[in-house]
UniProtKB/Swiss-Prot annotation:
Domain PPC: 102-238
Protein name: AT-hook motif nuclear-localized protein 21
GO biological-process terms attached to the record: anther development; carpel development; negative regulation of DNA-templated transcription
Species assigned in the record: Arabidopsis thaliana (Mouse-ear cress)
Domain of life: Eukaryota
């Protein structure tokens, strides 16, 4: 038992101390071989153990590095959810309209110089600009006014002298315009307070600067009233209006209605405009 314990102890000490094979010997050669084999197996096991630790450490390091790289890749490829912080507070670029709509109304203040025909100046402006002009009001003084009064059985009369504009309104459309689309109505006050007015059909000479407030447009729908059932059905089915300004302006049409003057309006002395009877001057509308 003591020899067995000693041998076991010697082998245990040999394995622990890692000494050479010649320190402890026994009579059994098989045990020596076994001891040597055990010692070699122990060194091989220790070497494999250290190598395994190194492999594990290197794998851990590579795993950490790969994990870090994978994490950075995930951060790059992954799209964050929701709005970025402060995105609502970023200044937005202004909206710039480079082209106005065809249905836009533009306001104008037209100044007609002294000695010029107000009617002719506005008509020329509408024709050259290719825009419809709607006259809203006007101020200033005029002379040599040729108008048509409804109380004079449609006769054209010329007012001599200087008059102040009380009211000025009308419309001017560039050609081709439907009949009666261009018209200008004026009310004037004389030197003694008399008021006279009518539709301008002749000269309207400015005695001083005349300021005209107007609005212009480029698109207008021309329609005939009253609408019959067939046309109303076509317009409701295929849409109407718009497009060309004068595409439907065919055939004859009545002129725009005149302002009716009160019957008690005091008349001032006028003389007939002889050019109207001879067919000269501006054609009546």
């Amino acid at each position: 038992m003591a020899g067995l314990d000693l041998g076991t102890t010697s082998r245990y000490v040999h394995n622990v101390d890692g000494g050479g094979g010649g320190q402890f010997t026994t009579d059994n050669h098989h045990e020596d071989d076994g001891g040597a084999g055990g010692n070699h197996h122990h060194h091989h096991h220790n070497h494999n153990h250290h190598q395994g630790l190194d492999l594990i450490a290197s794998n851990d390091n590579s795993g950490l590095g790969g994990g870090g790289g994978g994490g950075s890749g995930d951060l790059v490829m992954r799209r964050p959810r929701g709005r970025p912080a402060g995105s609502k507070n970023k200044p937005k670029p202004p909206v710039i309209v480079t082209r106005e709509s065809a249905n836009t109304l533009r306001a104008h203040i037209l100044e007609v110089g002294s000695g010029c025909d107000v009617f002719e100046c506005i008509s020329t402006y509408a024709r050259r600009r290719q825009r419809g002009i709607c006259v809203l009001s006007g101020t200033g003084t005029v002379t040599n006014v040729s108008i048509r009064q409804p109380t004079a059985a449609g006769a054209v009369v010329t007012l001599r002298g200087t008059f102040e504009i009380l009211s000025l309104s009308g419309s001017f459309l560039p050609p081709p315009a439907p009949p009666g689309a261009t018209s200008l109505t004026i009310f004037l006050a004389g030197a003694q307070g008399q008021v006279v007015g009518g539709n301008v059909v002749g000269e309207l000479m400015a005695a001083g600067p005349v300021m005209v407030m107007a609005a212009s447009f480029t698109n207008v729908a021309y329609e005939r009233l009253p609408l019959d059932e067939h046309e109303e059905h076509l317009q409701s089915g295929g849409g109407g209006g718009g497009g060309n300004m004068y595409s439907e302006a065919t055939g004859g049409g009545g002129g725009l209605p005149f302002f009716n003057l009160p019957m008690s309006m005091p008349q001032i002395g006028v003389e007939s405009w002889q050019g109207n009877h001879a067919g000269a001057g501006r054609a009546p509308f």
